[in-house]
Amino acid sequence: MSQGKIVQIIGAVIDVEFPRDSIPRVYDALKVESTGLTLEVQQQLGDGVVRCIAMGSSDGLKRGLPVTNTGAAISVPVGTATLGRIMDVLGTPIDELGPVATEERMPIHRAAPKFDELSASSELLETGIKVIDLLCPFAKGGKVGLFGGAGVGKTVNMMELIRNIAIEHSGFSVFTGVGERTREGNDFYHEMKESNVLDKVALVYGQMNEPPGNRLRVALTGLTMAEKFRDEGRDVLLFVDNIYRYTLAGTEVSALLGRMPSAVGYQPTLAEEMGKFQERVASTKTGSITSIQAVYVPADDLTDPSPATTFAHLDATVVLSRDIASLGIYPAVDPLDSTSRQLDPLVVGDEHYSVARGVQMTLQKYKELRDIIAILGMDELSADDKLTVARARKIQRFLSQPFFVAEVFTGSPGKFVSLKDTIKGFKAILSGEYDHLPEQAFYMVGGIEEAVEKAASL
């Protein structure tokens, strides 16, 4: 355990000088003795100086303070003892319930699984959310991105997915809060407690008030815990909210580390950092990690380098649209922009595939006719087009659904709709079975039977 001393402090980036014969390796964890602060080595600058990122606030540090090299990477507690606990980037519990009861720890930097260990799956994961199950189905062991700008419902969608999957599938989950609001983390904890699924979820938080070092590494902390469950042969869910903040934390420290910025001011290593993280989120022959990641889209621009880099790694993309949210349709999923590799007749079957494509064709036709309607009015449309518009508006409303986690806002009880009922409902609307019902009957209901009941009371 070699000793060094601080020689320079620039915000979250700290230079430490060690004797030449005992320079720490890259990714080694160093400890500032007087404050207990952990530093992670990023670069060796020569002359015994290493450049580090602080895993906490650098307030109160000064030059000359002694620093000890731990000789290993940051390691965090893993295993079932982490379930029901809230931890920070170093795996230290922050829920005031005492230490995590496990001796087992794993380093947060690990190699991705080897190619011959990987396993692909086409088994579907039913979420109970109609628009997702129908148009962008999730694969067990796949990676899903929830894309959306500010305030279109990424976190609410994610909370609903966790609630549905944790209750209906009774698997283990790891929730990683990367640079999001502390209030949401608090709400989420109480939501899980009330739903009685807290004992199946490990929570790792590095919120937006934390220094960039915490936000940069907290995603890896959560991932390491999920990898342990996978290696024990379990099927685990990894939720990351928000993967954009992981990129952003890298951007914040990149310039301080002396790197030239690339497009839009992002770090030049953007693709590499994202790839390192995403390649570890993989399913092996032992167990699976199904990952659902919220992706903030800056200024609603999907071509921004950060969301654009994330796209390449995903099996399904759920795009949340401000236009749909403004119509009052929640979840505000864009049915024409959201995609999934699983939407293939060989995976989902012919009936599901044809209904999903029929829904998209009807909505696309309605989108094309909207300009004509805006200029000339509905009366100028042909009888066929009028029918298409009427069905499209019913479909649009039937894609909305009351959420369990939003009951406090909407006042209506949440609904879990099975895939079978979802396909049955949309198939009936497309075939014209419900042409006689008013479109309001389809808004914020679960299955199609509920829409029929609602129509009777209108």
Curated annotation (Swiss-Prot):
SMART domains: AAA (SM00382)
Cell compartments where the protein resides: Cell inner membrane
Catalytic reaction annotation: ATP + H2O + 4 H(+)(in) = ADP + phosphate + 5 H(+)(out)
GO function terms (MF aspect): ATP binding; ATP hydrolysis activity; proton-transporting ATP synthase activity, rotational mechanism
Keywords, ordered alphabetically: ATP synthesis, ATP-binding, Cell inner membrane, Cell membrane, CF(1), Hydrogen ion transport, Ion transport, Membrane, Nucleotide-binding, Translocase, Transport
Membrane topology category: Peripheral membrane protein
PANTHER family according to UniProt: ATP SYNTHASE, ATP SYNTHASE SUBUNIT BETA, MITOCHONDRIAL
Subunit structure of this chain's protein: F-type ATPases have 2 components, CF(1) - the catalytic core - and CF(0) - the membrane proton channel. CF(1) has five subunits: alpha(3), beta(3), gamma(1), delta(1), epsilon(1). CF(0) has three main subunits: a(1), b(2) and c(9-12). The alpha and beta chains form an alternating ring which encloses part of the gamma chain. CF(1) is attached to CF(0) by a central stalk formed by the gamma and epsilon chains, while a peripheral stalk is formed by the delta and b chains.
Protein name: ATP synthase subunit beta
Organism classification: Bacteria, Pseudomonadati, Pseudomonadota, Betaproteobacteria, Neisseriales
Gene responsible for this protein: atpD
